[in-house]
Each structure stands twice: as C-alpha cells, then as structure tokens.
C-alpha cells in the first residue's frame, strides 16, 4: 500500500514506516567525509574513519585555506589519508570560505558521487577541529560515529521500515528563536550533521535540493529532503552536547 506525504511543492510516495526484521543487506553504502585539516584533525579523522565495517567506499573532501594550498599541503594530506584509510577511493578539494562553513565542501562531495552505484550515502565531517580543547565535542563525535558508522545496521533497519533519513539529535525547529531563522526555514535538523540518506528513495531530492549558502546551510539541506515523519532519530541526548561530557555508557546498545 502506497503512503503519500506532501510538504511544500514536493511529495513522497512510498511505504509507511513499519516494524520489520529484514535488512536491506544488498545496498551499497558510501561514506562522505568533509575534512578541514586543522589542529587535532588527525585525531578526529581517526575517530571517524578507523573502523568502517559496513560502508563500501569513502570519498573525502579536503577544505584548504589559500595559504595551505599555496604551500601544496594537500599533497601531504592526500598521501597520509590514503596510507592510513584503505577504503578511501577518491579525494577532492575545495577552498575554505568561513562564511559558508561546510557548504562548499559538501557540494564538492555531492558532485563526486556515482549515483548509479550507491544506494545509501552517509555524510560526516571533522566536527570539533576548530575547538580542539573541547572534549565534550569529541564525545559527541564518538557518539555520532557509533550510530552512523559502527552501527550502520541500525540505519539499514530504519530504511527497511520506510524511513529515508537516519541520524542522531533530531529536533524540530522553533521559528520564534532568532538564531534558527538563519537556517532558511527547514522543518527539522540533525544537530552535529552526521546523516545517512536512502538514495534509492530520494536520489532526485538529494541531487537537486539547493544547499543554502550560509554557515548552517548543510544542516538546513537535510531538513529539506523529506518530511520529518520519515526521518529517523537513532539517539538523542537529554542535554546540549557542547556543554557536558557524554561517555559511551550513555548510548551503547547491547544486542
């Protein structure tokens, strides 16, 4: 039975999310990593890319400051990444624009995807490299890595149930809050912006949806891909993760 959702000028026709025990084990999964190589970037990269058991391939965007590009630092970074992380099949580059945050690199990554091959795309980024002394952010990255990479089976399960997005820390917007007006009015967001997308279901939306050109553009992008009803939240902390530690005991699942 087809389930129809309408949001704005876009609609979704597909199965209603239901509980199912079968997994889409034949789906090809791609991991995207948006890297800004500053401060503790090697540690953050190790946290995210060291253990990638389920994704078939990795594409990395390296965002460079003009001075780093002039010094050809990207050549060293590329050699380092390919030596350490064998699943990396492609590395692309972008120049840093502080006003746009992750947007330029994210669009580069979207352009680099073979959409005929992959059914699932997982987006990650080097969160915390501009605040290397904040251990709480490092805890946050470990939590997102656990759910988005190490427990990719949970993503497969949610997609098998009819969801098209998967992540953590999902919140709906309160448009009365001034800061959130800069997100250009999407209905919800995944704080931290580690998100998996069911390309098999919403490839057209993923390719054609505009990524707003502001610092929070990537966060808004995912919130414009589908209704919140088919966006899955694997875990949500009871408090903001910038301010307090979040050890793994708070979220590890025994199965």
Please describe what each predicted stretch is.
Residues 1-255:
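ER/Golgi luminal nucleotide-sugar-dependent glycosyltransferases, focusing on the catalytic module
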């Amino acid at each position: 039975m087809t389930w129809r959702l309408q949001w704005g000028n876009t609609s979704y026709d597909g199965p209603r999310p239901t509980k199912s025990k079968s997994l889409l084990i034949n789906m090809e999964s791609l991991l995207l990593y948006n890297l800004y190589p500053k401060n503790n970037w090697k540690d953050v990269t190790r946290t995210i890319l060291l253990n990638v058991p389920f994704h078939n391939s990795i594409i990395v965007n390296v965002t460079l400051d003009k001075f780093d590009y002039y010094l050809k630092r990207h050549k060293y970074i590329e050699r380092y990444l390919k030596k350490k992380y064998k699943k990396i099949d492609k590395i692309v580059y972008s120049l840093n624009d502080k006003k746009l945050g992750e947007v330029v690199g994210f669009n580069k990554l979207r352009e680099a995807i073979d959409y005929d091959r992959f059914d699932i795309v997982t987006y990650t980024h080097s969160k915390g490299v501009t605040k290397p002394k904040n251990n709480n952010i490092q805890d946050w990255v470990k939590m997102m890595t656990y759910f988005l990479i190490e427990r990719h089976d949970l993503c497969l399960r949610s997609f098998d149930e009819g969801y098209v997005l998967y992540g953590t820390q999902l919140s709906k917007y309160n448009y009365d809050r001034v800061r959130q007006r800069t997100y250009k009015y999407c209905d919800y967001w995944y704080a931290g912006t580690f998100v998996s997308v069911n390309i098999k279901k919403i490839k057209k939306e993923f390719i054609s949806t505009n990524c707003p050109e502001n610092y929070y553009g990537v966060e808004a992008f995912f919130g414009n891909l589908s209704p919140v009803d088919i966006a899955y939240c694997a875990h949500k902390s009871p408090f903001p993760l910038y301010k307090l530690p979040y050890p793994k005991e708070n979220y590890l699942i025994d199965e």
